[in-house]
Regions:
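Alpha-helix-loop-beta-strand connector modules within alpha/beta enzyme cores
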Residues: 2-9, 13, 52-81, 103, ...
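Conserved functional loop/turn residues at catalytic and ligand-binding sites
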Residues: 35, 104, 109
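Glycine-rich, proline-tolerant flexible connector loops at the mouths of alpha/beta enzymes
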Residues: 38-63, 85-90, 109-125
Length: 125
C-alpha cells in the first residue's frame, strides 16, 4: 500500500488522528519515532527552516517539492503538505501537484487567497 492509500485508510479509521507539523527531515523522524501515523508539513515551517523568514511568497513550488521530498524520504509516513495558493494559475497548480506527487507527498491543501500569498501570521493580512 502506498502512502496515499495509507493516508486514506487512516482518515477512514475511527477516532481522531493527530498530525504534528514537521519543518524538516529530522523533526519528521522524531515524530515518526514518537508513534505518530501522519505528519503535516506547512509552508511557514518550510520557508522558516530554509530561509529563516516568514512565508511571504518568496519560494516557488519546486523549492517546496524538494523540501517536502526530503521529509518524505526520511520517514515511512504519509505527509500532508501546504501548497500555499498553488503558485499561480491552473497550469502552475497542475505542475505543482505533479511535483509534489513525485516528491512522495500523500496529500496537500491549498490556501484560498490571492497569489502570491500573504503570510497569515503577519500584520496586514
Amino acid at each position: 500500500m502506498n502512502v496515499r492509500q495509507r493516508y486514506r485508510e487512516i482518515l477512514k479509521g475511527p477516532g481522531l488522528t493527530f498530525a504534528p507539523g514537521a519543518y524538516d527531515a529530522l523533526s519528521a523522524r522524531i515524530m515518526e519515532h514518537c508513534g505518530f501515523k501522519v505528519i503535516t508539513a506547512g509552508g511557514y515551517a518550510a520557508v522558516g527552516s530554509l530561509l529563516g523568514e516568514p512565508d511571504g511568497g518568496q519560494s516557488n513550488y519546486r523549492e517546496y517539492a524538494d523540501h517536502y521530498g526530503r521529509i518524505c524520504d526520511a520517514v515511512d509516513l504519509p505527509i500532508f503538505c501546504d501548497a500555499d495558493t498553488g503558485f499561480g494559475g491552473v497550469h502552475n497548480i497542475r505542475k505543482m501537484v505533479r511535483a509534489f506527487e513525485r516528491a512522495g507527498v500523500a496529500a496537500l491543501f491549498l490556501s484560498d487567497q490571492v497569489f502570491p500569498n500573504r503570510c497569515g501570521y503577519m500584520p496586514g493580512k
